[in-house]
């Protein structure tokens, strides 16, 4: 088991699949726009250090519009319009914990408290959803999740939608809580995402295991 994300990345960097993957992403960047930027690709690790992880929210693909993705799943930069899935997450937060929706979509405050906001694909070409999912990111994500499965403290895995549920099928350690639900996208949210109370369930579990709950409120104090 690793002790830091830096150690984990160094370990992966020696593996042939990862060398090929980084080359493929580099080639794609040379030919066109790829999101997030190179410096933001692993920003979820920077904002949520390994020894502070409490919760994992697994997304699918980075946003593929200009200026949106910055390396945290579901999150956008502060001056960018809040995407529909995130609006629905905020609606559920209001229903669940009576927290007013923020006027921005920047989720760094969650990450800094121990919420690892990761996608299963870590890069994407502009305007082409899912364009990098076959480059080798699935292997990388599996390795991240393997580390988290073996984590020495109880974690909460929030899996919205079949893609996330399938990707995290290797989370088998009984000490962790897995919250499975419908994806918050406008197409699916009304089929069971609304009313699922993932935020209060997460905090109840953390408190039960003597870990500090997450302050989900993103409004400026």
From Swiss-Prot:
Gene3D superfamilies (UniProt xref): Uracil-DNA glycosylase-like domain
Alphabetical GO biological process terms: base-excision repair, AP site formation via deaminated base removal
EC number: 3.2.2.27
GO molecular function, one term: uracil DNA N-glycosylase activity
Localization, UniProt: Cytoplasm
Similarity comment text for this entry: Belongs to the uracil-DNA glycosylase (UDG) superfamily. UNG family.
Protein's name according to its UniProt entry: Uracil-DNA glycosylase 1
Source lineage: Bacteria, Bacillati, Bacillota, Bacilli, Bacillales
């Amino acid at each position: 088991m690793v002790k830091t994300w830096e150690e984990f990345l160094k370990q992966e960097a020696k593996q042939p699949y990862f060398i090929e993957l980084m080359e493929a992403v580099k080639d794609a960047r040379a030919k066109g726009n790829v999101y997030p930027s190179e410096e933001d690709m692993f920003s979820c690790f920077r904002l949520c250090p390994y020894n502070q992880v409490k919760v994992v929210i697994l997304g699918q693909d980075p946003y593929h519009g200009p200026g949106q993705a910055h390396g945290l799943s579901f999150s956008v930069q502060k001056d960018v319009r809040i995407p529909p899935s995130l609006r629905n997450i905020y609606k559920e937060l209001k229903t669940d914990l009576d927290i007013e929706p923020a006027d921005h979509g920047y989720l760094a405050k969650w990450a800094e408290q121990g919420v690892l906001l990761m996608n299963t694909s870590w890069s994407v070409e502009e305007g082409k959803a899912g364009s990098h999912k076959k480059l080798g990111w699935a292997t990388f994500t599996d390795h991240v999740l393997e580390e988290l499965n073996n984590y020495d403290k109880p974690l909460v895995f929030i899996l919205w939608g079949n893609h996330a549920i399938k990707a995290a099928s290797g989370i088998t350690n009984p000490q962790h809580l897995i919250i499975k639900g419908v994806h918050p996208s406008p197409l699916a949210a009304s089929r069971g995402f609304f009313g699922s109370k993932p935020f209060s369930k997460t905090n109840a579990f953390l408190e039960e295991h003597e870990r500090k709950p997450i302050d989900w409120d993103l409004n400026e104090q």
